[in-house]
């Protein structure tokens, strides 16, 4: 049985399920596998987010010939003083109060003015396709996969998609996650390059960037 083609059943409010209810479900002969739906978050608690408004104010207005990067995150608020002219379009799946736009604004700032904020970044700025697809407190993987499928199909001309997000638990060391498999399938179907964060490093001492030879 190809599990990637099997229908998925999403169970919500699991804290309200009794052991008898779960036993009854798991005893169904048509159920092959049951896994908890992973929650994906934009950043680790305690990590400060710097939007970089000063650096954005120093760069020239966007050129229509510059490339476009889809930023799939918590979104950029409409009318943002520094970023609004850089946003070429919006796909909105999440609205306030489920998003506060903080992390998405910070990531979009790096796409637009990365070199001004980090000298090791390329000098070439990019315009932004703002995809508000992530709740500020985290999203279920199944929701993210659906939103990504919709976003990619709506803008086939955008070939780079930034995903500065990660799971609250580590990945399985022996197999790719459902989310990773979905990204591979979307990449192969639409020719999109997904740039995915490797994780947040919160231990002391904090790592510097860019990495030196020593």
Where are these regions (language model features)?
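Hydrophobic, Leu/Ile/Phe/Ala-enriched alpha-helical segments that form helix-helix packing faces
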Residues: 1, 21-30, 111-118, 148-152, ...
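Autoinhibitory propeptides
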Residues: 1-60
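Hydrophobic beta-strand segments of well-ordered beta-sheets in folded domains
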Residues: 6-11, 33, 68-69, 126-129, ...
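Short, flexible loop/turn elements at secondary-structure junctions
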Residues: 15, 38, 75-76, 132-137, ...
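Catalytic cores of nucleotide-enabled group-transfer and carboxylate-activating enzymes in metabolic
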Residues: 21, 50-52, 59-60, 105-109, ...
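Plant-biased detector of terminal regions, especially N-terminal secretory signal peptides
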Residues: 35-46, 62, 70, 123, ...
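Subtilisin-like serine protease catalytic core
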Residues: 57-90, 94-142, 189-191, 204
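Substrate-binding/access-modulating region of protease and related hydrolase catalytic domains
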Residues: 134-214
């Amino acid at each position: 049985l190809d599990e990637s083609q099997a229908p998925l059943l999403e169970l919500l409010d699991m804290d309200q399920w009794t052991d008898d209810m779960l036993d009854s479900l798991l005893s169904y002969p048509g159920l092959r596998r049951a896994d908890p739906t992973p929650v994906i978050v934009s950043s680790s608690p305690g990590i400060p987010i710097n939007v970089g408004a000063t650096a954005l104010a120093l760069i020239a207005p966007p050129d229509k010939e510059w490339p476009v990067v889809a930023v799939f995150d918590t979104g950029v608020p409409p009318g943002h003083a520094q970023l609004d002219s850089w946003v070429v379009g919006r796909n909105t799946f999440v609205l306030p109060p489920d998003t506060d736009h903080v992390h998405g604004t910070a990531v979009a700032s790096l796409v637009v003015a990365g070199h001004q904020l980090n000298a090791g970044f390329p000098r070439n700025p990019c315009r932004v396709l703002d995809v508000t697809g992530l709740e500020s407190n985290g999203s279920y993987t199944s929701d993210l996969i659906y939103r990504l499928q919709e976003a990619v199909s709506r803008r086939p001309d955008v070939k780079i998609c930034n995903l500065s997000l990660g799971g609250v638990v580590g990945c399985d060391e022996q197999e790719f996650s459902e989310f990773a498999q979905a990204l591979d399938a979307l990449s192969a179907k639409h020719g999109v390059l997904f740039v995915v964060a490797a994780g947040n490093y919160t231990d002391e001492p904090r790592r510097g960037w860019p990495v030196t030879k020593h």
